[in-house]
Regions:
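Amphipathic, interaction-prone secondary-structure segments
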Residues: 35-85
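Acidic, proline/glycine-rich low-complexity IDRs
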Residues: 1-41, 86-168
């Protein structure tokens, strides 16, 4: 499978693991955590890592990240496009990073770039753990969900299914 790294509408295809490592570091550093004066999130609020089969038109597995390097936290969201053979079990859900010991403040990690929505603080993990998740996803080259952290089902907009205020 081919690794794609997308940010700000630009998709790159690292040719080696060294290139991927450099792009991962650049992506984490370049993510913009803030809001614009209009209340919208600027470009670069997320980075998408995905895998695509040669000759395919759509990626088959995704890892989206939001991070704030200044405060040292980020969020990972993983899902597949449910094309066979990835059907059933974990493949039927979107998964959000879960931190059993979340920060005692809201790190305001962007969950939806079109609205002022943020991830739940319990989804925020320290940046070294986030980087390990990204590296695991990219190194395996299968698109499988990384196993180095805990996950909870949720939505692309950051809503967690384990919260009482989750609305289907």
């Amino acid at each position: 499978m081919i690794l794609e790294i997308s940010m700000e509408g630009i998709t790159k295809y690292p040719a080696s693991w060294h290139e991927a490592e450099v792009m991962i570091a650049e992506a984490i550093a370049a993510i913009s955590p803030g809001e614009s004066s209009a209340g919208r999130h600027p470009k670069g609020s997320h980075v998408w890592f995905s895998f695509i089969e040669p000759g395919a038109t759509h990626s088959c597995a995704y890892l989206s990240i939001a991070a704030n390097e200044a405060i040292g936290f980020g969020v990972a969201t993983w899902w597949t496009n449910n094309l066979p053979p990835r059907v059933g079990g974990i493949y039927d859900y979107m998964w959000i990073s879960d931190n059993p010991t979340p920060p005692d403040f809201d790190p305001r990690l962007v969950s939806d770039t079109h609205y002022p929505l943020y991830h739940d603080p319990a989804s925020a993990i320290p940046l070294p753990r986030l980087r390990a998740v990204i590296e695991e996803f990219c190194r395996c080259r299968t698109g499988e969900r990384p196993e180095s952290i805990s996950w909870v089902t949720g939505e692309l907009n950051g809503q967690r299914h384990d919260r009482p205020d989750f609305d289907v």
